[in-house]
Amino acid sequence: MGRRFVVTVRIRRTGRSPQVRVFLVQFLGSSRPRSANGTRGFVALVLRPERIARRGPQPHPGPGDDDGQRQSGSSPALLWCRFELRGPHHPLPTGARRSAGGLPRHSGSTAPGRGAAGCARCLGSPAARPGPRAGTSRRRAVFAVSTLLRWERFPGHRQA
């Protein structure tokens, strides 16, 4: 009713020897021939979330990895802070940028919503900030962990 394959995967670990895992993949349903590339792609897609989850935080993050910023281009932290006006090129005067509530045009009393905290998302630890770049880099986690070593038909497979 389906196809079964034996998959051998090598998992590279930093500072330790690579680990080799062998497991059985069974596709249920149609027994029509499928392309090997499509099946390999499916297994890689299944392995990807586990690779990312097992990566964990980096002990010594490099520049641009853990602080919510990129090495070049605009920082996502600037995009989160819509109300925090930066730079001398802004048309509002300095007093409006540094008002009591942290928002423009709210000087004197507390501003609605955020209070004196300013942009609430920019406060606290960089790793605790929301967004795609908080914590570890997904790009590094995807490309550096596992390699598909062997892909073969399961020897005990029977056609129905």
UniProtKB/Swiss-Prot annotation:
<dbReference type="GO" id="GO:0035985">
    <property type="term" value="C:senescence-associated heterochromatin focus"/>
</dbReference>
<dbReference type="GO" id="GO:1904750">
    <property type="term" value="P:negative regulation of protein localization to nucleolus"/>
</dbReference>
<dbReference type="GO" id="GO:0097371">
    <property type="term" value="F:MDM2/MDM4 family protein binding"/>
</dbReference>
<dbReference type="GO" id="GO:0061629">
    <property type="term" value="F:RNA polymerase II-specific DNA-binding transcription factor binding"/>
</dbReference>
<dbReference type="GO" id="GO:0051059">
    <property type="term" value="F:NF-kappaB binding"/>
</dbReference>
<dbReference type="GO" id="GO:0000122">
    <property type="term" value="P:negative regulation of transcription by RNA polymerase II"/>
</dbReference>
<dbReference type="GO" id="GO:0045893">
    <property type="term" value="P:positive regulation of DNA-templated transcription"/>
</dbReference>
<dbReference type="GO" id="GO:0033598">
    <property type="term" value="P:mammary gland epithelial cell proliferation"/>
</dbReference>
<dbReference type="GO" id="GO:0006364">
    <property type="term" value="P:rRNA processing"/>
</dbReference>
<dbReference type="GO" id="GO:0010468">
    <property type="term" value="P:regulation of gene expression"/>
</dbReference>
<dbReference type="GO" id="GO:0030889">
    <property type="term" value="P:negative regulation of B cell proliferation"/>
</dbReference>
<dbReference type="GO" id="GO:1990948">
    <property type="term" value="F:ubiquitin ligase inhibitor activity"/>
</dbReference>
<dbReference type="GO" id="GO:2000435">
    <property type="term" value="P:negative regulation of protein neddylation"/>
</dbReference>
<dbReference type="GO" id="GO:0043065">
    <property type="term" value="P:positive regulation of apoptotic process"/>
</dbReference>
<dbReference type="GO" id="GO:0055105">
    <property type="term" value="F:ubiquitin-protein transferase inhibitor activity"/>
</dbReference>
<dbReference type="GO" id="GO:0005730">
    <property type="term" value="C:nucleolus"/>
</dbReference>
<keyword id="KW-0805">Transcription regulation</keyword>
<dbReference type="GO" id="GO:1903051">
    <property type="term" value="P:negative regulation of proteolysis involved in protein catabolic process"/>
</dbReference>
<feature type="region of interest" description="Interaction with CDK5RAP3 and MDM2">
    <location>
        <begin position="1"/>
        <end position="63"/>
    </location>
</feature>
<dbReference type="GO" id="GO:0048103">
    <property type="term" value="P:somatic stem cell division"/>
</dbReference>
<dbReference type="GO" id="GO:0061771">
    <property type="term" value="P:response to caloric restriction"/>
</dbReference>
<dbReference type="GO" id="GO:0005654">
    <property type="term" value="C:nucleoplasm"/>
</dbReference>
<feature type="region of interest" description="Disordered">
    <location>
        <begin position="49"/>
        <end position="74"/>
    </location>
</feature>
<keyword id="KW-0053">Apoptosis</keyword>
<dbReference type="GO" id="GO:0060058">
    <property type="term" value="P:positive regulation of apoptotic process involved in mammary gland involution"/>
</dbReference>
<dbReference type="GO" id="GO:0001652">
    <property type="term" value="C:granular component"/>
</dbReference>
<dbReference type="GO" id="GO:0019901">
    <property type="term" value="F:protein kinase binding"/>
</dbReference>
<dbReference type="GO" id="GO:0019789">
    <property type="term" value="F:SUMO transferase activity"/>
</dbReference>
<dbReference type="GO" id="GO:0042593">
    <property type="term" value="P:glucose homeostasis"/>
</dbReference>
<dbReference type="GO" id="GO:0031648">
    <property type="term" value="P:protein destabilization"/>
</dbReference>
<feature type="region of interest" description="Disordered">
    <location>
        <begin position="90"/>
        <end position="116"/>
    </location>
</feature>
<dbReference type="GO" id="GO:0000209">
    <property type="term" value="P:protein polyubiquitination"/>
</dbReference>
<dbReference type="GO" id="GO:0001953">
    <property type="term" value="P:negative regulation of cell-matrix adhesion"/>
</dbReference>
<dbReference type="GO" id="GO:0005737">
    <property type="term" value="C:cytoplasm"/>
</dbReference>
<dbReference type="GO" id="GO:2000346">
    <property type="term" value="P:negative regulation of hepatocyte proliferation"/>
</dbReference>
<dbReference type="GO" id="GO:0043616">
    <property type="term" value="P:keratinocyte proliferation"/>
</dbReference>
<keyword id="KW-0804">Transcription</keyword>
<dbReference type="GO" id="GO:0007265">
    <property type="term" value="P:Ras protein signal transduction"/>
</dbReference>
<dbReference type="GO" id="GO:0090399">
    <property type="term" value="P:replicative senescence"/>
</dbReference>
<dbReference type="GO" id="GO:0005634">
    <property type="term" value="C:nucleus"/>
</dbReference>
<comment type="subunit">
    <text>Does not interact with cyclins, CDK1, CDK2, CDK4, CDK5 or CDK6. Binds to BCL6, E2F1, HUWE1, MDM2, MYC, NPM1/B23, TOP1/TOPOI and UBE2I/UBC9. Interacts with TBRG1 and COMMD1. Interacts with CDKN2AIP and E4F1. Interacts with CDK5RAP3 and MDM2; form a ternary complex involved in regulation of p53/TP53. Interacts with NOP53; the interaction is direct and promotes ARF nucleoplasmic relocalization and ubiquitin-mediated proteasomal degradation. Interacts with TTF1 (via the N-terminal region (NRD) and a C-terminal region); the interaction is direct and inhibits the nucleolar localization of TTF1.</text>
</comment>
<dbReference type="GO" id="GO:0004861">
    <property type="term" value="F:cyclin-dependent protein serine/threonine kinase inhibitor activity"/>
</dbReference>
